């Protein structure tokens, strides 16, 4: 009975994700990082003058406001940035 219970616990732990963690792209989208607790948004920062070339990507807790020179795009799904 103990073996059955232990097996059930192990299978449940393996099958269920015990804490969802967001994955965000780094500057080079081939690589990504797992965000720490509390950082539940991915972001991409780029210069307004060159919108096709991101300057920075990563995890963040609150999406910053864009300015006349810098634009931020935020999202909340895996590798969406």
Swiss-Prot record:
Residues 1-21 form the signal peptide. GO terms for biological process: killing of cells of another organism. One of its GO terms (cellular component) is membrane. Disulfide bonds join 24-42, 35-59, 63-74, 75-80. GO terms for molecular function: toxin activity. SUPFAM superfamilies: Snake toxin-like. Expressed by the venom gland. InterPro entries: Cytotoxin_Cobra, Snake_3FTx, Snake_toxin-like_sf, Snake_toxin_con_site, Toxin_cobra-type. PROSITE patterns: SNAKE_TOXIN (PS00272). It holds the Pfam family Toxin_cobra-type. It is found in: Secreted; Target cell membrane. Its main location: secreted. Keywords: Cardiotoxin, Cytolysis, Disulfide bond, Membrane, Secreted, Signal, Target cell membrane, Target membrane, Toxin. Shows cytolytic activity on many different cells by forming pore in lipid membranes. In vivo, increases heart rate or kills the animal by cardiac arrest. In addition, it binds to heparin with high affinity, interacts with Kv channel-interacting protein 1 (KCNIP1) in a calcium-independent manner, and binds to integrin alpha-V/beta-3 (ITGAV/ITGB3) with moderate affinity. Belongs to the three-finger toxin family. Short-chain subfamily. Type IA cytotoxin sub-subfamily. Monomer in solution; Homodimer and oligomer in the presence of negatively charged lipids forming a pore with a size ranging between 20 and 30 Angstroms. This is Cytotoxin 2b. It comes from Naja sputatrix.
């Amino acid at each position: 009975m103990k073996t059955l219970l232990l097996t059930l616990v192990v299978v449940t732990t393996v099958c269920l994700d015990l804490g969802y963690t967001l994955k965000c792209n780094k500057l080079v989208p081939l690589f990504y990082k797992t965000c720490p607790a509390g950082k539940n948004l991915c972001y991409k920062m780029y210069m307004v003058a060159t919108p096709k070339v991101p300057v920075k990507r990563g995890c963040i807790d609150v999406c910053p406001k864009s300015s006349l020179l810098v634009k931020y795009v935020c999202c909340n799904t895996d590798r969406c940035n």
